[in-house]
């Protein structure tokens, strides 16, 4: 793939959760995960155009690390989008009912529109970790392509996808193995 191709990248990393907590001992990761170091080593800055947006999904538990990943990939933090989910999820302190998306910018990547709020109530997806289709609709309405979705769970017309759960994907090999 040519360097500097994508104007917008969406990433939903397989954050590693240490399930050593007694409440989580019965759980297993439903997919291979990556450590913070492995995520930071991905050459995302090579894939992004000189002017680009990055939408980086994170959980409350990984928020402090997500800023470092965003920076390692060559982006500057600009804003956060909050997905307010119906119902309660898991959580050690509070039961999480939100997920966060950090918006990073590289260069000066103009927005198509500026009338978008920072919180959204989208339906909860049926599959584990799947994000709402309405989110990618929002991204397309705000940011310019070409588009790449990293760690994709499905294919989308007009997007390149990379991930072990999409039907067709760009085959990048980095030599990493799932986190223990």
What are these regions (language model features)?
Residues 1-180:
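Class I S-adenosyl-L-methionine-dependent methyltransferase catalytic core
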């Amino acid at each position: 793939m040519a360097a500097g191709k994508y104007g917008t990248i969406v990433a939903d990393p397989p954050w590693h959760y240490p399930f050593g907590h007694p409440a989580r001992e019965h759980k297993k990761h439903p997919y291979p995960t990556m450590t913070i170091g492995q995520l930071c080593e991905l050459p995302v800055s090579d894939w992004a155009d000189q002017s680009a947006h990055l939408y980086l999904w994170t959980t409350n538990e990984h928020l402090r690390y997500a800023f470092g990943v965003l920076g390692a990939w060559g982006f500057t933090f600009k804003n956060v989008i909050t997905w307010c989910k119906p119902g309660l999820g898991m959580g050690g302190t509070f039961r999480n009912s939100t997920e966060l998306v950090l918006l990073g910018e590289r260069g000066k990547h103009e927005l198509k529109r500026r009338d978008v709020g920072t919180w959204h109530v989208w339906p909860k997806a049926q599959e584990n970790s799947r994000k709402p289709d309405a989110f990618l609709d929002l991204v397309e309405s705000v940011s310019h392509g070409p588009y790449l979705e990293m760690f994709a769970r499905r294919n989308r017309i007009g997007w390149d996808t990379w991930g072990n759960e999409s039907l067709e994907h760009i085959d990048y090999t980095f030599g990493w193995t799932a986190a223990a």
